Amino acid sequence: MKKITGLFVSALLLLSSCGSVPVTGRKQVLLVSDSEVLTSSLTQYSEYIKSAPISTNTKGKAMVTRVGQKIAAATEEYLKSNGLASEVKNFAWEFNLVKDNQVNAFCMPGGKIVVYEGLLNICSSDDELAVVVGHEVAHAVAKHSNERISQELLAQYGAQILGQALSDKSERIQKIGNTVYGLGAQYGVTLPSSRKHESEADYM
């Protein structure tokens, strides 16, 4: 009975938590609310900014802000013109240039954009920087963070169900089952999803 109940609850979770990615229309499972993701993201971002060495490169900071504002405006305009105006409230845009030689940038849920100085050594024009920042913003618009969190929650729940199903089996069988499940979750869900998210962000 426990096994059947577990499967039934899982099915209900999946059916009640489906969403679609803007632009691509791909179906995705989102078990965590936007408000929960945004609250967690803002907390992490605030802690990061407190300790991050903010750049004093005036020209670079102006470039990041200029590009970021254009992408933010384009993103909001797209959402509004495609029946997704309610999503705009989830973005409180911020743009920061961090003193770090890494060639990197990221956009957290909620539109918190951080660019590392090292990236400006590669992206010397607004258009070049816009390609990278636009890619990162696409991850936020597509709610890829929420989707990854949801996949982790499903994996944890699946492990619990498997544990119940194998509870009357030998310890060796339980270990084998857990190992196979872990590998299946990693190579069957997590890694393919990561590649899918990158391709989707490029497309968007």
Predicted regions and their residues:
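A Zn2+-metalloprotease active-site environment signal
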Residues: K2-G6, C18-M204
